[in-house]
C-alpha cells in the first residue's frame, strides 16, 4: 500500500499529548514568574560555530533593487541575550530553530527549541533548577551530576585534560575505532569523537545526567572556570543515551567573545567553510553589559519523544522535512 506522506507523521493523539506537554512547560515558567519572549527567526547575522550550518535567504525590496542577506536562526541565543542586556530579567522561549545538514532519528532541519536564561545564577544553582524542571516534566528521578573529566576516567581510563595525541590514538586502537580516528591529528576533535562514540550512548540510562566542566577548547559561549583555566562553565544534559540540552554559565566579556568569533572564522577558513559575518548587535549588547547569567537550550522534540516513549523525533512532529 502506498504510504500516505501527505498525512502527519505523528498521530493526532500524540500531537494532543505534545500540546499538553508544552502547556505544562509554560505553566512551570508561569509559576516562577519567568517571562516568555518572542525573538526573530530571521537574522542579519548567523553563528560562526564550525559545527553549525545555517540556512540563508534574501529579502528583496518591493522595487527589486535592494537585496539583504538574512539567515534563519540556529537558536534564539543572541537575540535573547540582547534582551537580557536590556534588563529583561529571567526569560524563556519556545521557538522553531533551523540547522542545515542535520537529519536523522534525533534531528530535523527545523526543530523546536526551549531556551531559558536566569540572571545572577551560577551554573551549579542553575543545574539544580533544570533538574527540578526535568523531574516535573519528564516525571523522572532526581538527576546525577558528573564532570567531563571524571566521565573519561571512569569509561576510558584516561584524563582528557592531560592526555596527548599518542595516548588518545592508543585508546582508539584498543576500542577498535582507529579506522575512524587514525587520520585525526587535532587533540580536541579526537576527544570529542571518543566522547560521542564511546561515552554518550552509555550515560543517563535510568535518570538524567548532567555532564559539567567541558574542556576549555569546547567552551563555545561559556565562561572559563576561574580556578582551572583548562575547563569551561559548560554543561550538557543526557537521558537514555540522548543529548537533551546544552548550557553555559555565560561568557560576558565582549573582548573574549570577539576573539572566539575570529578564531571560529579562522578555523572555517582552514576547513574551506564560508566565513561568517560577526553579529555586531550581539557584541554591542555584551559591550553595554550582559548580566552574569546561566542559560540552557533544550531540544523540545527530543524531550517529548522521551516522554511519549517514541524512537524518533519524527514521531512527535507533524510534518518533518520529508513531508513538509
UniProtKB/Swiss-Prot annotation:
Subunit structure comment from the entry: Homodimer.
Function of the molecule: With EpmB is involved in the beta-lysylation step of the post-translational modification of translation elongation factor P (EF-P). Catalyzes the ATP-dependent activation of (R)-beta-lysine produced by EpmB, forming a lysyl-adenylate, from which the beta-lysyl moiety is then transferred to the epsilon-amino group of a conserved specific lysine residue in EF-P.
Pfam family, one: tRNA-synt_2
Catalyzed chemical reaction(s): D-beta-lysine + L-lysyl-[protein] + ATP = N(6)-((3R)-3,6-diaminohexanoyl)-L-lysyl-[protein] + AMP + diphosphate + H(+)
GO cellular component terms attached to this protein's record: cytosol
Entry-linked SUPFAM superfamilies: Class II aaRS and biotin synthetases (SSF55681)
Record carries keyword Cell membrane: no
Source organism of the structure: Buchnera aphidicola subsp. Acyrthosiphon pisum (strain Tuc7)
GO molecular function, one term: acid-ammonia (or amide) ligase activity
UniProt name for this protein: Elongation factor P--(R)-beta-lysine ligase
Gene3D superfamilies in the record: Bira Bifunctional Protein, Domain 2 (3.30.930.10)
Residues noted as binding substrate in the record, renumbered to the chain: 75-77, 117, 250
Listed GO biological process terms: lysyl-tRNA aminoacylation
Family: Belongs to the class-II aminoacyl-tRNA synthetase family. EpmA subfamily.
Enzyme class: ligase
Entry binding sites for ATP: 99-101, 108, 243-244, 299
Keyword Protein biosynthesis: no
The protein's Enzyme Commission number: 6.3.2.-
InterPro entries: Aa-tRNA-synt_II, aa-tRNA-synth_II, aa-tRNA-synth_II/BPL/LPL, EpmA, Lys-tRNA-synth_II_C
Gene: epmA
